[in-house]
Amino acid sequence: MTDLKHLASVIEQAFEERASISPATVSSEIKNAVLDALAALNNGSARVAEKVDGSWHVNQWLKKAVLLSFRIWDNQVIDGAESTFFDKVPMKYEGYTQAMFEADGVRVVPGASVRTGSFIGKNVVVMPSFVNIGAFVDEGCMVDAWATVGSCAQIGKNVHLSGGVGIGGVLEPLQAGPTIIEDNCFIGARSEIVEGVIVEEGAVISMGVYIGQSTRIFDRETGEVHYGRVPAGSVVVPGNLPSACGTYSLYAAIIVKKVDAKTLAKVGINELLRAVSEE
């Protein structure tokens, strides 16, 4: 069993000396520590962020391990079905057999790109999309066509990422937290959730909603404005809020209602959003 505390210690020290590290100069201890950290990310035994006592905790040393990996790997030719590629990070499913896919319990559709160092849980369907290093996609998710799960992004159980969705990645600055989509969320087509925003459990994001840290998230029922966090059970659509002078308006994400898990399961996403548009 990998000693994560020891790995963290080696990675932290190596990161302070990263300017002097290259494929030619890296020590076997540092190289093995980085590879072990990536293996832990790859199999899900470690993750960049995890919920502890109701709050998200970021394991910064794992982000540092990912950054160090770019210093210890040379670019190399990667063979693909339709083309040849040249990159530092190998593909997660390179060399996988049918038995290995069946053991993992995942479906990976041709055209999907999943990098080593990311975790894909059981019963996940990965359509032609991109999952970056350090990302964690929990069980039962749909990663639909042309969606992007950025570096170190955390996707909870039973999340639906619709076509063209962008979930932002973060490696630097180190103090920045990853973008997090909690369990049982729905992210509508072409929406973008970035810059470490947290979408809490059971939220429904309509098509074409863009949320970063500076985006106003306005609750029309309470008048409250949130930043960087979509409250649990929120149904969110794109909208605008007027300026103080009343001469212009600026984009905002609008919370039009709240739903619980029971209502969400009973009504369904399409009916819920259709009802919102008719209000």
From Swiss-Prot:
Name of protein: 2,3,4,5-tetrahydropyridine-2,6-dicarboxylate N-succinyltransferase
Presence of the UniProt keyword Acetylation in the record: no
Disulfide bonding pattern of the chain: none
Binding residues annotated for substrate, in chain numbering: R107, D144
Family membership: Belongs to the transferase hexapeptide repeat family.
GO molecular function terms attached to this record: 2,3,4,5-tetrahydropyridine-2,6-dicarboxylate N-succinyltransferase activity
Gene field: dapD
EC number from the UniProt entry: 2.3.1.117
Phylogenetic classification of the source organism: Bacteria, Pseudomonadati, Pseudomonadota, Gammaproteobacteria, Alteromonadales
